[in-house]
Amino acid sequence: MHAHPYPDGPRLLADIGGTNARFALEYASGKIINAKTLACADFASLTLAVQAYLNRWSCGGIRHAIVAIANPVTGDSVKMTNHHWEFSIEATRSELKFDTLLVVNDFAALAMAVPMLRDDEFEQIGGGTAVTEGVIGVLGAGTGLGIAGLMFVDSRWLAIESEGGHVAFSPSDERELAVLQYCWQRYDHVSAERLVSGPGIALIHEALAAQQTPHPAALSTAAIVARAMSRADPLCQETIECFCGMLGTVAANLAVTLCTKGGIYIGGGIVPRLGGYFATSPFRSRFESKGRFSSFNAQIPTSVITAPFPAFPGAAAILADYLDSKTSNPFAVRRAGHESSTGASLPR
């Protein structure tokens, strides 16, 4: 059966991180085309980035749009944590001449997409079996560290927004404690995101290098990852090993916090690029190393999302639910501690 095009034209989908702005068009339910990634640094504002994308495809007359952004969304004003863009949702909607502009947390959108992933769009790391309709945890490292949850309630999936990447970093061994102590010389508060992220990889490398004499030269995150994967630099390998272990701790904490019997899914820009290197890293052993809850976590599957633009289907579902229900909640996802919200009905 062919999906019928939307009578009011294609819908704009955007996934905005601290480094990249990803755009696509949904011309019919589930039919997403023209995905394109733009560099946030190339544009002074979100509006200019949107206009550049639409001009590329000569696509005017967009009426409905959704932006999934790496930031908490608590009202009309949005100021990004890991980029300089800040904007009013209503002013942006008016400037772009949209009828609808929803802005939601990026990992809430990614969480909503998880039930729609095909088997070839994720790779399980380690053992465990998901419980049908069990709570799902989603996390991922990129410019920052995104975290969200997903619950099945009243025949629909509801995303739980979170800023869990900003919890205090918790070291699990002496090496990680040494890294934390190095960071304390520079920061009063060291969050999980400070280390378990793209910029965090460079900081871990710097902290480990400081323990060597002479100190190895500082490297970019891209260089560290490349050297580690080619196994050409022992310090870079140790850095990525440390990073993967830290991510395992974050995932383990999320698992016991939400009782994620439906599984943990890992997105973001870093881990999917590590491929098989991540599969043999300390991530899974750290995930299961949870003291009295080790057997609990061992039953929970952990998977890496490999789809190239995984947040788009979730964002599209949130927008569709909003337009279908005309809900008064402008974000169309469930927030922790906030009851007046809706979620999109997705396949199970």
Where are the model-predicted features located?
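ATP-dependent carbohydrate kinase catalytic cores
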Residues: 100-131, 222-234, 238-244, 249
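Glycine-rich phosphate-binding loop of actin/hexokinase-like ATP-binding domains
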Residues: 124-192, 275-276, 282-288, 292-297
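Short, glycine/charged-enriched secondary-structure capping and boundary segments
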Residues: 27-28, 80-83, 117-119, 152-155, ...
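Short, acidic Gly/Pro/Ser/Thr-rich loop/turn segments
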Residues: 21, 72-74, 144-148, 203, ...
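ATP-binding/phosphotransfer module of carbohydrate and carboxylate kinases, centering on a glycine-rich
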Residues: 1-56, 60, 178-348
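Active-site metal-binding loops of divalent metal-dependent hydrolases
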Residues: 107, 143, 269-270
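Short glycine-aspartate micro-motif
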Residues: 11-15, 62-66, 102, 128, ...
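Short beta-strand-loop/turn "lid" adjacent to the catalytic site in phosphate-handling enzymes
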Residues: 57-103, 108-121, 138, 273-276
